[in-house]
Amino acid sequence: MTYEKIKLQGIDKEGTEHEYSISDFKGQKIILYFYPKDNTSGCTQEACDFRDNMNRLTPLVTVIGVSPDDIKSHRGFQEKQNLNFILLSDTEHKLAEAFSVWKEKSMYGKKYMGIERSTFLLDENGKLEKEWRKVKVQGHVDEVLGYLTK
């Protein structure tokens, strides 16, 4: 299955639950950013950086955050951080696997599977235009904006 057809539950910027697929956004450029976990320091900073730059991003792209967290977790994260973009729940990591961001990771010598922080720009037809892999949170949204406004 191609990533355009994968359907995931998510919440819109008002917190309403919907089923989404990339093909739902045909005609719009999309920033699809994958992050490991709601309410962790790096993920919160990245989400807040996107939130704080939505006035600059919205005319150019639709921003969508994706993590393996469930809808309940996303809703709490969205409310706590006042997030103003779509969050998708990829609990079975179908979309993460389609974008090759579901990877073996290691912490304190323990290996586990998780999201490799990555961002993808999809064009109006849902095709990959640009990718940022192994993202460092600091300055990332500025880098994305720099690319979008060049």
Mark where each language-model region is:
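Chalcogenol-based redox active-site neighborhoods
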Residues: 1-150
